[in-house]
Each structure stands twice: as C-alpha cells, then as structure tokens.
Amino acid sequence: MDYPGNLFVVAAPSGAGKSSLVKALMELDSAIQPAVSHTTRPPRGQEKHGREYFFLSPEEFDSMVQRDAFLEWAHVHGHRYGTSRQAIEERIAHGKDVILEIDFQGAINIKRIFSNAVLIFILPPSWEELRSRLQRRGEDSPEVIELRLKNAATEMAQAREFDFVIINELFERAVFDLKTIVHAQRLKFSAQRRARAETFRALQIP
C-alpha cells in the first residue's frame, strides 16, 4: 500500500551513534516523529518508558506477539525488540513522516512490508573507534563489548541491503547527511505531488 507519509528506518551496530543522530535530527526537524519501539531489556541511564522505548516484561511482550500487535520483532543481544504495527500505519497513513531506530534484522523485515520505507545504515569510521565508543559508554562488561563487536561484523555485512549509508566520523557532518536524506525524500515527485497538490493542479501536471 502507498502511504502519504514517509517511513525512515535507521539501523546501526551498537555504539555507532544511531540514537544520538536521530535525536539531533528531530531537534532540527519538528515535522518528523519518532516511532518508539517495545523491548524487554531494562532501561539504561536516564531512559524513560515511552520516550526511548516502551519497557515491557517478557509476559507483556508475549501478549503483544500473540495479538499480532508487532509489525516485526526480533531477538537482539539477548533481549526482544518489537515495532507496533498500529502506531506506524496510523501515522504514515495520515501523511506524517516517521523515523524508527531498529536493528538490521527488523529494518530488512520492515522493507518487505513497506516497500517505500527508506533504510539508512550508520557505520563507525573504524573498528578501533567503535570499540572505543562502546568502552566510553561504560554500560557493558568487557565480555559484552566483545559480543557486541562480534555482532557488529554480522550487522555491517548487511549494509548493502540499505538505501543509504552514513559514516559517523564527524557527528555534525553525519547529522547533516541524515537531514539531507530526509529532505531529498520529501522532494521526490510523488511526495511533492501529495504535499503541493493545488500547485500541481494549477500547473496541469498529472
């Protein structure tokens, strides 16, 4: 189905800076709305229920799975993550632009359902920098960091499945790149015809 709104799906290996980039984009672009995922993992730091994630018990997550409430869900780093079907469909059906942070498995699954979804993959500039960022975050044991790096190799091998790739070396440049992708999507013929329907009619453009 062709929805009037845009769905931007951002994925990255842990530590690449995905969440920081999406947060910065939304501070610059009030027209784009976040799609908050559900997860069984515990909150980190200052994360709040309903802002970064909806934090669920395994039983609550199971209930949503049984109700087919998720557009997709997957196991990631020992926890489960899911995307609400209703929340996404309602927003883009009403012409809203939605951005979703998700793992690479979920991104590819969503593309199968929403063929017009724009998939964006965030890469670190090097393995050394990725390791350094995970260590500076101070949230994981050395064993968990090694597991995340191992998973990152698998995830980054899937980058070819995405529409756009951003290398997050200089943060300000990466934010600019992300904003540029969003803006370019809004300038596509189909998007402009919907957004400026009166102008298109006046110019007799079918």
Curated annotation (Swiss-Prot):
It is found in: Cytoplasm. Its EC number is 2.7.4.8. Gene3D superfamilies: Guanylate Kinase phosphate binding domain (3.30.63.10), P-loop containing nucleotide triphosphate hydrolases (3.40.50.300). InterPro entries: GK/Ca_channel_bsu, Guanylate_kin-like_dom, Guanylate_kinase, Guanylate_kinase_CS, P-loop_NTPase. It catalyses: GMP + ATP = GDP + ADP. It comes from the Bacteria. Belongs to the guanylate kinase family. NCBIfam families: guanyl_kin (TIGR03263). Essential for recycling GMP and indirectly, cGMP. This is Guanylate kinase. It comes from Polaromonas sp. (strain JS666 / ATCC BAA-500). The gene is gmk.
